[in-house]
């Protein structure tokens, strides 16, 4: 990953989350990262993000298929499909994520899905 390539960074993010490499994943984010998901509490800071991936994420055994990545300045928009398990049950849904970069790190992340909550 290069600090100046948002597309490479977001693609690396999905690889790391699918491989459950959360230490490397969290390193892609700014220390004061803010992660927002409609209907869910906001996650603020690297430690809260790490805790979310280690303990609070309801999705498991899954993979992301990326359909599109669009970069405009310091923002990368990603559209894709997630397939995996939610609370032990098979699940598949579409998602759109927006990653805002500052100094080569993901500073803000917004996730939207075609489900009520994940």
Language model segments and positions:
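Short, low-complexity N-terminal intrinsically disordered segments enriched in polar/charged residues
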Residues: 1-23, 27-28
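N-terminal short leaders/motifs
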Residues: 19-25, 47-56
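Structured beta->alpha junctions
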Residues: 14, 41, 68-70
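A beta-strand edge to alpha-helix "cap/lid" segment located at domain peripheries
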Residues: 2-5, 36, 50-118
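Domain-scale activation on soluble regions of proteins
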Residues: 39, 43-44, 107
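A generic structured-segment signal
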Residues: 29, 41, 51-53
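Conserved short-loop catalytic and cofactor-binding motifs
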Residues: 10, 37-40
């Amino acid at each position: 990953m290069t600090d100046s390539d948002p597309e490479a960074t977001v693609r690396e993010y999905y690889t790391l989350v699918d491989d459950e490499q959360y230490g490397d994943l969290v390193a892609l984010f700014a220390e004061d990262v803010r992660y927002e998901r409609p209907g869910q509490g906001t996650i603020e800071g690297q430690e809260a993000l790490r805790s979310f991936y280690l303990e609070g994420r309801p999705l498991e055994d899954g993979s992301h298929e990326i359909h599109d990545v669009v970069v405009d300045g310091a923002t990368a928009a990603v559209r894709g499909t997630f397939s995996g398990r939610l609370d032990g049950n098979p699940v598949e849904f579409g998602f759109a994520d927006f990653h805002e970069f500052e100094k080569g790190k993901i500073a803000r992340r917004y996730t939207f899905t075609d489900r009520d909550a994940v």
